[in-house]
Amino acid sequence: MFLLDPFSGISGDMFLSAMIDFVDKEDFINTIKKVIDVEIEIKKVKKCHILANKVNIIPKCINCNANTYKDIKNVIKSSDIQEDIKITALEILKILAEAESKVHNVDVENVHFHEVGNYDTIADIVGAAYIINKLNLKNNCLYKPINVGNGFVRTEHGLLPVPAPATAEILKGLKIFFSDINEELTTPTGSAIIKYINPKLAKGAFIIKEVSYGAGDKDLNLLNALRVFRVEDIKREDIVLLETNVDDISAEILGYLYEVLDGKVRDLHFIPTYMKKNRPAYTIRAIVDRDIAEEVAKIIMRETGSLGVRIFDIERITADREFKTIKLFDESVRLKVGRVNDEIISQKPEFEDLKNIAKKYGIPLKDLYKLINISQIKN
């Protein structure tokens, strides 16, 4: 897995430079050249005395003047590159065009890119599409907050605030920060690339496997580079804890809540407690996947009458889990096997499987658990 660290912003060429060591350089260059006639130079440079990669795009093409959405789209569409790379490139270009269309209030097909566009943007987009597909980055990448810089940037429309309007539009939903450097550190193309990748905000602990730096063009007091980590994610789950207190609810309703939330929650607890004025109550706690936390919170409020549910970000390190099947009285019983560092730490039978055997053969459930334990020891 890769983690993007745009502590000094992100641009198209910074992304290519940071990722170039992780892909086949010759295939990368040939893919871009199938779209646009350019020379591509890959070299090592130093930024703030730190060694970094630099990908330079040098024009020698007759179609370098393509700078409208329609023109660039046609250049990419008519190229003979791998279809999935072509689709990704067109999607990144579309993100750029739709942002420009919105901030300038023009039809997307008539968008003129002005500062972006021309040979370098085409190469950046196609190169990024190549990298994204070869490394499977889409929806499978992490990032840290993006440094957008500060101050103003000069355009043909005049001075515009940083981030530029199109960049700000693209960055919606991503975590950014302003620094004390009065420069445009994050460009529209860089924003469109990271927006398309749709990374998750990096949280928790990781093991670093490799580090790469992609140099930018600016010379700043800050290291002007995009840093990329290839990391091994310590096995965690993206989960949240929902919690609320209720003091006017019956045990029957709580039992029904179990049924309603079956299949939606990882775990559900009802904890007896006392509230103000010594009122007996329950604390309801549910562990859920982040993407359905709001849905589950609303179910809890609707079913219990609670006026609010607290949401806590939590981390949970988990063992590797797998199922294996054993035979008991010629019936199949699934065992959930837990491992840490390839060492088996637990083997637990599925309750429903044992319950069915207990009913079928008239054997106490507790005796079946004992037989399972003996069977595991023998195996």
Curated annotation (Swiss-Prot):
* UniProt keyword Transmembrane, yes or no: no
UniProt keyword list: Nickel
| Transmembrane regions | none
A molecular function GO annotation: nickel cation binding
Q: Which residues form a coiled coil?
A: none
Q: Does the keyword GTP-binding apply?
A: no
| Membership in a protein family | Belongs to the LarC family.
HAMAP family, per the entry = LarC (MF_01074)
Question: Could you identify this protein by its name?
Answer: Putative nickel insertion protein
Naturally occurring in which organism (per UniProt): Methanocaldococcus jannaschii (strain ATCC 43067 / DSM 2661 / JAL-1 / JCM 10045 / NBRC 100440)
Q: What is the lineage of its organism?
A: Archaea, Methanobacteriati, Methanobacteriota, Methanomada group, Methanococci
